[in-house]
């Protein structure tokens, strides 16, 4: 995971069961994945920049699909496995996350929260405190960094919940957070059975 460099550039727009996703990369590394229009998504990735994005389909029918960069193919395979409920999940693409040192410390901890597991903001703050060179880490500061996570789903900010199991916020919208946690069997009736097995068809190898 890298931590410095130039601004993100919009690259690809792809459908998902929870709405369109915008995927960005830098130097062959995944640097951003947002639900379209979500809070904290860079302005350049909103609707006015959409013509600059390459639209992808999960059936691989787009003419340029064979020429996709390796990190894009890896991201697509991971997302298909995730939304299809295929475990264990494949390896993550290489990540190029940009933020303050504190934000990077929080995001590194998010990478260690497993599928179908939730962690409170307070517990996350304690984990960050073990690596952060200050005597204490505030829960509000941690929550702010979680909300600024630039790679949705893969860097699992949706698994961070409030005290005593309260849902808490989500930059992509609370409804999406509920759906993602239900898909993983951690929220709501049916423990995710209704949402598991979302179908995406074939992806390029």
Map each language-model feature to its residues.
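Long, intrinsically disordered, low-complexity Ser/Thr/Pro-rich regulatory/activation regions
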Residues: 159-184
